[in-house]
Amino acid sequence: MAQIVRQSKFRHVFCKPVKHESCMSDIRVTEITWDSLFCDVNPKFIAFINRGAGGPFMVIPVNKIGRVDKDYPFVDAHKAPCLEVAWSPFNDNVIASCSEDTTCKVWVIPDRGLNRNLSEPAVELTGHQKRVNTIAWHPVANNVLLTAGGENVMFMWNVGTGEALLEISGHPDQIWSINFNFDGSQFVTTCKDKKIRILDSHTGEVVHEGMGHEGVKPQRAIFVKDGLILSTGFTKRSERLYALRAPEDLSTPIVEEELDTSNGVVFPFYDEDSGLVYLVGKGDCAIRYYEVNNDAPYVHYINTYTTNEPQRAVGFQSKRGMSSEENEINRIYKLTTKGVVDILQFFVPRKSDLFQHDLYPDTRSTIPALTAEEFMEGKNAAPNRQPVNAAAAAAAAKPKVQVAKKANILSTLAPTAAESVPTQSYSERPPSSQQPSPRPSASPRPRPVVDDDMGIVTMREAPPSRPASSRASRTEIPPKEESKVDPMKPKQAVQLKSRAARDEPGGGAQTAGQRRAAAELERIKRDQSRTADEDNTLAPPPSSSRASASPRGSVSAASDVGHVPQNMDELLEDLMKMKAVLRQHERRIRMLEEEIADRNMSNAYSF
């Protein structure tokens, strides 16, 4: 059963214009009557052919907002009206222009745009005898430009040297349009004789030829998916239409459909990454867009966007200038007759805010695949590719797990030799004669004790071990009953005692805090007496040349500047001396802090 609704991810593409407050305005476009777009755009700049003496055109940063001054710098390009401009696909600062003065010139725009009028081109290409109608850059080879003149002759130029690589003749009448295929090996032309021709880029020979549209008005043709040709033109009754043709039989269209009746030439724009085609009529208010694929009828209508102002100039942005965070698929810059640049953004609706890989395959890169010399040698190559959003593509790419093979280190070890090792069962105890004699009891070593109240680590003698039998005969000591504080008694009724009355043996019952403070004082006194003994023991002999009573002097004396320990025992001895000095300082600091705390408490409670 055939599907009623066509399945496509571009079926719901919609257009959302940017507000006029965020667009450029007051641009004076040229008034010449020539079937050209008068505009071209890249991710950095947008160029318009404007009014003025000779053939000037303006180059404006693409992110400029607001009114463009009348004295804004421009490119004073030609002596006669400029007919067409085209940006280089590999350098966003290089632009080519053609004119009625029979010349084609190449310009280099500064990175920050023009700050003064530019009148000196980087390269001037002279060879045509009449006006240069149209130009096209080679999509793969660097610095290769194709121009078509009014004398029905085309030139393939090496822009880097300014030399003509190839002269192509054979068209009996005026050439209206030229367009390269995917890899630049061929290009298609439309001519005033109503024929569509496909030519070889290296030799200039006609590969395929066929009749196009019947109308006498200009028609255009471009390469689309799988080498097919999409052409736009007129019927004998001035009805505009498009047709999809196979290169082997250009005279018989695969699909042909009428659009409307009008006099404006229809310009096709093709996005090779998505397969979308946009048909823009000169002087129209509508933009139609279609999808080209391999499913019949091959060209599927999507929608039409209509505005109130007709378009005077149109530019199609490359995929490198899209906003992939918003799922923007294409962007068209339309200059209206009022001088306002409308920015038309085309989006694919998606619920997810993540980068959509199916909408953004790798697009054409700014790195050329061929040089001009390689192209002239007859080489062809596919264009280089780059991700639309390199950061998002790298973040979403799944890391590849690589298992590194390492050498087996244990395989180099020799196996253990077989020896008769006596084994012993752990269930059998050795005889009493083989039991080791008990070790003599040594004096208990001091163990670190942490004081919960002061947070100080002290060294105390470990209590002697008790026999297991005494543990059973030990009686439990009943807990000490503490005096309960009446919670209903106000603090003002509490009678505070002095320190002397509190310390006396008959001074009455002491609180838990008082008992803890008294015990701490006793402990400090014992530590002081013990430290004095240790200092006397560890103190080095007095030196006649270096003697100091201050702690700093003791450190210097203990360290003996210039003395280098000769063995581990001397190093440990020096460390013990320094530890003794540090402990002395710590005790002095604690005593000073306690004295300050006692004084503050005495002052607060008037002891």
UniProtKB/Swiss-Prot annotation:
Keywords linked to the UniProt accession: Actin-binding, Coiled coil, Cytoplasm, Cytoskeleton, Repeat, WD repeat
Biological processes, Gene Ontology terms: actin filament organization
GO cellular component, one term: cytoskeleton
Any one GO MF annotation of this record: actin filament binding
Residue stretches of biased makeup (Pro residues): 437-447
Regions annotated as coiled coil: 563-602
Keyword Cytoplasm: yes
Domain of life, per lineage: Eukaryota
Cellular compartment(s): Cytoplasm, Cytoskeleton
Region Disordered, annotated ranges: 415-564
WD repeat start-end pairs: 77-117, 127-167, 170-209
Record-linked PANTHER family: CORONIN
Known function: Required to direct the migration of Q neuroblasts along the anterior axis of the body during larval development. This is dependent on its asymmetric expression in Q neuroblasts.
Name the record gives this protein: Coronin-like protein cor-1
